[in-house]
């Protein structure tokens, strides 16, 4: 596989700072298993995969910022009111 260059990525990102921030966020998503890669992994590190996705135009800031909405229990469902009123 050919190397990914900064110039390849800058075709899809405005500047180097945004590239670093985008690649960092995407690499973290890939490393923690939060998201599936959009390109073949090919035994690369998450950072390289993130840069390859950016260079291919498959990932941008909108894709990285999308969070999966998970239906969960209410925020204070496990909060025990009786235990707190006894403490007062």
From Swiss-Prot:
Reactions catalysed: RNA(n) + a ribonucleoside 5'-triphosphate = RNA(n+1) + diphosphate
Report the EC code(s) recorded for this entry.
2.7.7.6
Q: Give the GO biological process terms.
A: DNA-templated transcription initiation
Name any one GO molecular function: DNA binding
InterPro entries in the record: DNA-dir_RNA_pol_omega, Pol_omega/Rpo6/RPB6, RPB6/omega-like_sf
Q: Which GO terms of the cellular component aspect does the record hold?
A: cytosolic DNA-directed RNA polymerase complex
Q: Which UniProt keywords apply?
A: DNA-directed RNA polymerase, Nucleotidyltransferase, Transcription, Transferase
Q: Is Membrane among the key words of this record?
A: no
Q: Give the family per the record.
A: Belongs to the RNA polymerase subunit omega family.
Oligomeric state and partners? The RNAP catalytic core consists of 2 alpha, 1 beta, 1 beta' and 1 omega subunit. When a sigma factor is associated with the core the holoenzyme is formed, which can initiate transcription.
Q: What does this protein do?
A: Promotes RNA polymerase assembly. Latches the N- and C-terminal regions of the beta' subunit thereby facilitating its interaction with the beta and alpha subunits.
Q: What is this protein called?
A: DNA-directed RNA polymerase subunit omega
Q: Which organism is it from?
A: Pseudomonas aeruginosa (strain ATCC 15692 / DSM 22644 / CIP 104116 / JCM 14847 / LMG 12228 / 1C / PRS 101 / PAO1)
Q: What is the lineage of its organism?
A: Bacteria, Pseudomonadati, Pseudomonadota, Gammaproteobacteria, Pseudomonadales
Q: Which gene encodes it?
A: rpoZ
């Amino acid at each position: 596989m050919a190397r990914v260059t900064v110039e390849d990525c800058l075709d899809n990102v405005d500047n180097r700072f945004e590239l670093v921030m985008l690649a960092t966020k995407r690499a973290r998503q890939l490393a923690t298993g939060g998201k599936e890669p959009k390109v073949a992994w090919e035994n690369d590190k998450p950072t390289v995969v993130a840069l390859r996705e950016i260079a291919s135009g498959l990932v941008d800031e909108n894709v990285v910022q999308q969070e999966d909405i998970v239906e969960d229990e209410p925020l204070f469902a496990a909060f025990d009111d009786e235990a707190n009123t006894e403490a007062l």
